[in-house]
Amino acid sequence: MAKDIKFSADARAAMVRGVDMLADTVKVTLGPKGRNVVLEKAFGSPLITNDGVTIAKEIELEDHFENMGAKLVSEVASKTNDIAGDGTTTATVLTQAIVHEGLKNVTAGANPIGIRRGIETATATAVEALKAIAQPVSGKEAIAQVAAVSSRSEKVGEYISEAMERVGNDGVITIEESRGMETELEVVEGMQFDRGYLSQYMVTDNEKMVADLENPFILITDKKVSNIQDILPLLEEVLKTNRPLLIIADDVDGEALPTLVLNKIRGTFNVVAVKAPGFGDRRKAMLEDIAILTGGTVITEDLGLELKDATMTALGQAAKITVDKDSTVIVEGSGSSEAIANRIALIKSQLETTTSDFDREKLQERLAKLAGGVAVIKVGAPTETALKEMKLRIEDALNATRAAVEEGIVAGGGTALITVIEKVAALELEGDDATGRNIVLRALEEPVRQIALNAGYEGSVVIDKLKNSPAGTGFNAATGEWVDMIKTGIIDPVKVTRSALQNAASVASLILTTEAVVANKPEPAAPAPAMPAGMDPGMMGGF
């Protein structure tokens, strides 16, 4: 395919147009008075959201060069979301600010490599300064406060706080759609382990790339499944029940995996295969945990069992299983309460006798998986559109809350980024490195400027007053008051803030150091088909 190539200023200008189109769409959502964006969907009602990464992923531009710029900013939002679960709009605003300030200087003759060095040095200093002012989060009220700020709902904050209290900060919390109008919290027995599907063709939801199995059977074995004939009798029995199947095995390869995938694609039956969690003896113990939780039996040579001889009675069962590319969650296994209690007692006794810190940690993980359960936040709303929007907000809030517990919190509303300006400004750099530092200094102001603008205030006035205010004091854009941000509950997880800055600086630096851009040439429009010989053009008028 032929290529279009742009160089130096033309290349950067085209990419920046794409950066601006995406960033200008996303940044209207920032802050307590941020607006919503309506996204057209191929099927069903449009999606109304203020979630930065969701908006960024939807944007595709017609011009290939502009689209590359937009996609780089979308990558910033996605990366920030993957690391911290929130802060995607802040990351987008920071990227746009660094790109614009940097481009001015590059156009004026500054060296992009020197600018990049200065940006990297200034960003590292800002991140260390953010970590230094972070305050730890502990206690139910503090956790609820973080969640409430992110979701813009005190009720959601309470649900997330209670869920984390009941299943632990690292416990499994899932978000589902409720059948009613009200949002509610439910804790059910469940287990999560860090193994995802072996093939992406096994997913049932192509948008979220997850496989949801309702009321499935579960085959548990420490053997490798390579020959489909070994499990064919069992598959035929499961097929008769019209229920899905989860296969947990040492591995599924050879002819077995493509055969399972092909039958899944054809709709013959719904099957998902995952690798068994853990290694060695620990793997055997975890498989036994899963078997007891689900009421199944581990097919293993240790018990003299062979796959080809396995019957339906060896299969475990559960109310629901969700599998993504990295993990599997089993909810409401069918194992007996007595067997599960005995297994928990056994693990507790092993905890008391072990002398190894590593073994103790792994035993505690297994105990949490068996005893902790899974918290389910069931989201209710009057309409499907409102339901989707609420789910996205709760997902963001949950991720932000976990990030806050992990690394602590700082003053929200962009205040923390203004606070660290003093540390960055103190860096003694020269030449283009100093220019890079100054670019970051200007970018650190941008989130506050945008939050104020979205709330109807003049950003520059707010920033000037903020720089001269006592530490911790900030601008509450929701009320227009100057308050102690942390005491008022306007807080951001430091992990979210520093991830947004790091990812923005990284991608913006790449754009500034770009000297050539290569894109596919648009395909020429196909010519209209020739009219058959002898046909009178006037004959077409009747259609």
Swiss-Prot record:
Pfam family, one: Cpn60_TCP1
EC identifiers of the protein: 5.6.1.7
GO cellular component, one term: cytoplasm
Subcellular location per the Swiss-Prot or TrEMBL entry: Cytoplasm
Key words of the record: ATP-binding, Chaperone, Cytoplasm, Isomerase, Nucleotide-binding, Stress response
One GO MF term attached to the UniProt entry: ATP-dependent protein folding chaperone
This protein's record includes keyword Nucleus: no
Residue numbers binding ATP: 29-32, 86-90, 413, 476-478, 492
Reactions mediated catalytically: ATP + H2O + a folded polypeptide = ADP + phosphate + an unfolded polypeptide
Gene Ontology biological-process entries: protein refolding
SUPFAM superfamilies: GroEL apical domain-like, GroEL equatorial domain-like, GroEL-intermediate domain like
Domain of life where this protein originates: Bacteria
Function noted in UniProt: Together with its co-chaperonin GroES, plays an essential role in assisting protein folding. The GroEL-GroES system forms a nano-cage that allows encapsulation of the non-native substrate proteins and provides a physical environment optimized to promote and accelerate protein folding.
Family that this chain belongs to: Belongs to the chaperonin (HSP60) family.
NCBIfam families associated with the record: GroEL, PRK00013.1, PRK12849.1, PRK12850.1, PRK12851.1
Subunit record text: Forms a cylinder of 14 subunits composed of two heptameric rings stacked back-to-back. Interacts with the co-chaperonin GroES.
Protein name as annotated: Chaperonin GroEL
Organism this protein belongs to: Streptococcus pyogenes serotype M6 (strain ATCC BAA-946 / MGAS10394)
